[in-house]
Amino acid sequence: MIKVGIVGGTGYTGVELLRLLAVHPKVEVTLITSRAEAGKCVTELFPTLRGHYDDLYFSEPESHALGACDLVFFATPHGVAQAMMKEVLAAGVRAIDLSADFRIRDIEVWEKWYGQQHGCPELVAQAVYGLPEIHREQIKDAQLVACPGCYPTSIQLGFYPLLANDLIDPRSLIASSASGVSGAGKQAKVDLLMAEMGESFKTYAAGGHRHLPEIEQGLRDMQTPDAAEPELTFVPHLLPMIRGIHSTLFARLIENVDLQALFEDFYANEPFVDVLPQGVLPETRSVKSSNICRLAVLEPQSRGTVVVASVIDNLTKGASGQGIQNMNIMFGFDETMGLAAPALLP
């Protein structure tokens, strides 16, 4: 049994962590922080968790209290984890950061895209990028894991078999991705009102989304050594639904192979990647509240362009569920522990 703390427990990723950890047999959540809600019981804010956290109260985030944990999750906006991480790690506590603070290795690139000076650049090189399907061995011994973003997870898992086998032109990559509104967090914004985005579908951040450098860094990591630098055109969209991501990926093939067999063999031993049968395409509802990434691969009209459809739940495999998957690996638990429930339907 390990003691877990959560910094930033009132956002969507924080409450998703609470939901999933409530049934994890090897975890006790002993600390949860929120400056705004300090002193309140968790179940006062989240009645769905009654019976699981009736004695757990929000507190101010203090490093000495976090030092009593075995592991701390940061479910905070960017900029928060980097201000506290040095003290947490110095106390011998391992950490999983769900924010973007430690994902991008090039500090200048991070500062450009996130618009602020990085508060703890010396720890960036120490952080392990927490995409288990690619970095499982490094995650096992990591003190600090940077959990991938939601779009990066869906896109990297879709391109991985193709780039790792040098089967596509890395300068031809396109990702058209769509997310539910929970990916934008809980802030009150006019463009996220039901009257504004309901029954509608739109492109946003087409000129440059801050997940782009993270994705391209991850794509480079999975390539063969002599491959050209990946160039990705990434266009995100907003869907009028709460949770889920659908990424449609395109690339030019440079070698003809049995794509279906390639994907099935490549992911045969991955518990959270499901390659659908040939001719079956994934739906976001098929992964709702689950830690599964579902993939389909095809070559439409046999014209040399491979298309991959990739779906995840942005709050689960795209955030908190993947964080718990990383935790399981770090502490030697079964990787699927606490994450085996199937998707919700309807």
Swiss-Prot record:
EC class (word): oxidoreductase
Enzyme Commission number, as recorded: 1.2.1.38
Gene Ontology cellular component annotations, sorted alphabetically: cytoplasm
Record key words, sorted: Amino-acid biosynthesis, Arginine biosynthesis, Cytoplasm, NADP, Oxidoreductase
Coiled coil region boundaries: none
Role: Catalyzes the NADPH-dependent reduction of N-acetyl-5-glutamyl phosphate to yield N-acetyl-L-glutamate 5-semialdehyde.
NCBIfam families recorded: argC (TIGR01850)
Record-given protein name: N-acetyl-gamma-glutamyl-phosphate reductase
Natural source organism: Teredinibacter turnerae (strain ATCC 39867 / T7901)
